[in-house]
Curated annotation (Swiss-Prot):
Component of the multiprotein chromatin-remodeling complexes SWI/SNF: SWI/SNF-A (BAF), SWI/SNF-B (PBAF) and related complexes. The canonical complex contains a catalytic subunit (either SMARCA4/BRG1/BAF190A or SMARCA2/BRM/BAF190B) and at least SMARCE1, ACTL6A/BAF53, SMARCC1/BAF155, SMARCC2/BAF170, and SMARCB1/SNF5/BAF47. Other subunits specific to each of the complexes may also be present permitting several possible combinations developmentally and tissue specific. Restricted to the brain and peripheral nervous tissue (at protein level). Present in virtually all neurons in the cerebral neocortex (layers II-VI), hippocampus (CA1-CA3 region and dentate gyrus), cerebellum (molecular, granular and Purkinje cell layers), spinal cord (dorsally and ventrally), dorsal root ganglion, retina and the olfactory bulb (mitral and granule cell layers). Expressed specifically in postmitotic neurons (at protein level). GO terms for cellular component: bBAF complex; brahma complex; chromatin; GBAF complex; kinetochore; nBAF complex; nuclear matrix; nucleus. This is Actin-like protein 6B. Residues 39-82 are annotated as: Essential for mediating its function in dendritic development. InterPro entries: Actin (IPR004000), Actin_CS (IPR004001), ATPase_NBD (IPR043129). Involved in transcriptional activation and repression of select genes by chromatin remodeling (alteration of DNA-nucleosome topology). Component of SWI/SNF chromatin remodeling complexes that carry out key enzymatic activities, changing chromatin structure by altering DNA-histone contacts within a nucleosome in an ATP-dependent manner. Belongs to the neuron-specific chromatin remodeling complex (nBAF complex), as such plays a role in remodeling mononucleosomes in an ATP-dependent fashion, and is required for postmitotic neural development and dendritic outgrowth. GO terms for biological process: chromatin organization; chromatin remodeling; dendrite development; negative regulation of cell differentiation; nervous system development; neuron maturation; positive regulation of cell differentiation; positive regulation of cell population proliferation. Induction: By retinoic acid of P19 embryonic carcinoma stem cells induced by this treatment to differentiate into neuronal cells. The keyword Nucleus applies. Its main location: nucleus.
Length: 426
């Protein structure tokens, strides 16, 4: 291996895509990630004394992290939930390392020093954080080669494009990111906090208005079937530990997220009371057995994504709806490349899986697109590709023969220090 260049397919590179909602990791060249688990981890401040290391738990100086769906779902005394990310960037490094350790030991089941690593990062990631991550991977995990790539670029690659406007609507934010020839155009990034978590908040308010209790499954010992709209008949578990508020909240959110995915739908034209009242209702049963039909509210809640003006409780309400986010972003780019952006608007992120999301977006954009431009929306039909697109893009990229000279090799890192990430990873 002269000069530390790897051969495309036999590298066995790993691809990590760590988002605010879930962690996706696996081998390059495969079509979907091996691991897909919540980024949120349970944190227990351990008492002094011998703690046995259990499945999915990592112990660090008096802290126990509960990672992965199973470990996180066990109710425990005083376990808080936390996330290593803030605004899409790594904030809590200790927690981040616990997630990496878990991924290596339980999902990849291999030693870190055998595999080059390609990681995705937020397009607005800071230089200091990029350097710290590079240092962490080479020093602590001793990996042979490393590369950092912006999520939007990977998403474009996953959809067979090197130029396009990536509209990414995830848990914490919705962003429009222009990509040109595989580079992110920083000046055109537009972010809006109206995304999956915002919709969850709206659902929570709906349940409060309708006086529906959200009871997460962990509290329920037994339930009886009841008539539609009748008060639920369920038994609470007897010996429940004193769970923390943050953990209980997290479990409630899981119920809400299921409701979101099953019931909500984006109206294909701006929301109208009369039209919404005519829509077919959807039946949904809460974990405690309470069940009822949802009609107009199915359309009213997601409307806030596209038209924030009628959402109550948004301060000053200068927020941009999804359609505006796209047009504003394209408007901030050079006039010569706009046709290429309008010609491939790539839709990605778990929140875009709401029924009717792309139809509505298409409709809004066709009204806003200048007549001289051709508009094309690229939205994969498979749930998996939309949720995992940055990962899939990374998997494609890291297994390309032509990419192999792009890696930062361990040798380069040792000679050039952590600054080399700024030079080698755009």
């Amino acid at each position: 291996m002269s000069g530390g260049v790897y051969g495309g397919d036999e590298v066995g590179a790993l691809v990590f895509d760590i988002g605010s909602f879930s962690v996706r990791a696996g081998y390059a060249g495969e079509d979907c990630p091996k691991a897909d688990f919540p980024t949120t981890v349970g944190l227990l401040a351990a008492e002094e004394g011998g703690g046995l290391e259990l499945e999915g738990e990592k112990e660090k100086k008096g802290k126990i992290f509960h990672i992965d769906t199973n470990a996180l779902h066990v109710p425990r005394d005083g376990a808080e939930v936390m996330s290593p990310l803030k605004n899409g960037m790594i904030e809590d490094w200790e927690c981040f390392r616990a997630i990496l350790d878990h991924t290596y030991s339980k999902h990849v089941k291999s030693e870190p020093n055998l595999h080059p690593v390609l990681m995705s990062e937020a397009p607005w990631n800071t230089r200091a954080k990029r350097e710290k991550l590079t240092e962490l991977m080479f020093e602590q995990y001793n990996i042979p080669a490393f590369f950092l790539c912006k999520t939007a670029v990977l998403t474009a690659f996953a959809n067979g494009r090197s130029t396009g406007l990536v509209l990414d609507s995830g848990a914490t934010h919705t962003t429009a990111i222009p990509v040109h020839d595989g580079y992110v155009l920083q000046q055109g990034i537009v972010k809006s906090p109206l995304a999956g978590d915002f919709i969850s908040m709206q659902c929570r308010e709906l349940f409060q208005e309708m006086a529906i209790d959200i009871i997460p499954p962990y509290m329920i010992a037994a339930k009886e079937p009841v008539r539609e709209g009748a008060p639920p008949n369920w038994k609470k578990k007897e010996k429940l530990p004193q769970v923390s508020k943050s953990w209980h909240n997290y479990m409630c959110n899981e119920v809400i997220q299921d409701f979101q995915a099953s019931v909500l739908q984006v109206s294909d034209s701006p929301y109208d009371e009369q039209v919404a009242a005519q829509m077919p209702t959807v039946h949904y049963e809460m974990p405690n057995g309470y069940n009822t039909d949802y009609g107009a509210e199915r359309l009213r809640i997601p409307e806030g994504l596209f038209d924030p003006s009628n959402v109550k409780g948004l301060s000053g309400n200068t927020m941009l709806g999804v359609g505006h986010v796209v047009t504003t972003s394209i408007g901030m780019c050079d006039i010569d490349i706009r046709p290429g952006l309008y010609g491939s608007v790539i839709v990605t992120g778990g929140n875009t899986l709401l029924q009717g999301f792309t139809d509505r977006l298409n409709r809004e954009l066709s009204q806003k697109t200048p007549p001289s431009m051709r508009l094309k929306l690229i939205a994969s039909n498979s749930t998996m590709e939309r949720k995992f697109s940055p990962w899939i893009g990374g998997s494609i990229l890291a297994s390309l023969g032509t990419f192999q000279q792009m890696w930062i090799s361990k040798q380069e890192y040792e000679e050039g220090g952590k600054q080399c990430v700024e030079r080698k990873c755009p």
